[in-house]
């Protein structure tokens, strides 16, 4: 049972039109190279579209990362960046989003090599707040290619958690039957997180358990339990019942998964 989300992060560079687009593109390539050398390339995707103060570019980048199967996004300011289109990208992307920006490489080239991405991050964060768009911004979001690669790697478990919660169903058993949520305010915080919860009666679980008596899968599960317990197997006589219970729960998960990916 696959119950852990696989994250694929699309990395989109953005550029303001009063700065060279090549500055953002080259810095994006350096970032991709740095991440690949440190962590491999399986979890990232380099979007070829550089957004240059254009809502059309934003739509093109959005479609590109969607078609590439990305479920998380990094908006990378290679220079000051276009506040409108970069924040629109974050608004319309259906998944966790991170913002980071490129530090200046050198003080020797302040004509074509200066990006002012630090200032761009300040403006981007303000515009995101104006739009009520929530994204992840590292504590120090401006850095070299290596430093931004580390930031993206730190974003991975955050993205995985958000993706998982949005597609998670919690199944529980208690005194209430299914579809009887009256007087159950404690589940509201789960709804606020985007988590679905299905409460079932313990009597339903007991009935399902009894229906699994003599299930042909029980001996194999018992054998696996014996291997796991080793010398700690002090009560082997209860293992068949535990195996029956495990199979009951696994079948329940598959039968009650509904439209959720993770249970």
Where do the model's predicted regions map?
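Conserved metal-phosphate-binding beta-hairpin within the catalytic cores
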Residues: 263
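Metallocofactor- and cofactor-centric catalytic cores in central/energy metabolism, strongly enriched
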Residues: 1-163, 167-171, 176-260
């Amino acid at each position: 049972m696959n119950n852990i989300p696989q994250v694929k992060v699309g990395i989109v560079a953005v550029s303001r039109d009063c700065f060279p687009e090549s500055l953002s593109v080259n810095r994006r390539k350096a970032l991709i190279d740095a991440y690949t050398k440190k962590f491999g390339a399986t979890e990232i995707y380099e979007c070829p579209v550089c957004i240059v103060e254009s809502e059309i570019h934003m739509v093109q980048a959005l479609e590109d990362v969607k078609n590439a199967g990305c479920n998380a996004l990094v908006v990378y300011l290679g220079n000051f960046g276009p506040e409108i289109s970069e924040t629109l990208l974050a608004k319309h992307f259906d998944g966790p989003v991170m913002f980071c920006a490129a530090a200046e490489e050198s003080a020797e080239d302040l004509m074509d090599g200066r990006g002012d991405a630090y200032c761009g991050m300040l403006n981007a964060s303000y515009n995101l707040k104006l739009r009520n768009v929530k994204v992840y911004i590292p504590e120090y979001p401006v850095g070299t290619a290596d430093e931004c690669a580390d930031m993206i790697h730190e974003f991975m478990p955050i993205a995985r958690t958000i993706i998982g919660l949005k597609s998670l169903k919690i199944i529980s058993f208690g005194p209430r039957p299914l579809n009887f949520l009256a007087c159950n305010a404690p589940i509201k915080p789960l709804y606020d997180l985007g988590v679905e919860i299905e409460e079932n009666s313990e009597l339903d679980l007991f009935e399902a358990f009894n229906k699994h008596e003599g299930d042909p899968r029980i001996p194999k599960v018992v054998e696996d339990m014996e291997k796991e317990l080793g010398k700690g197997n002090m009560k082997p006589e209860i293992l068949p019942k535990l195996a029956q219970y495990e199979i009951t729960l696994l079948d329940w998960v598959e039968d009650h998964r509904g439209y959720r990916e993770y249970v």
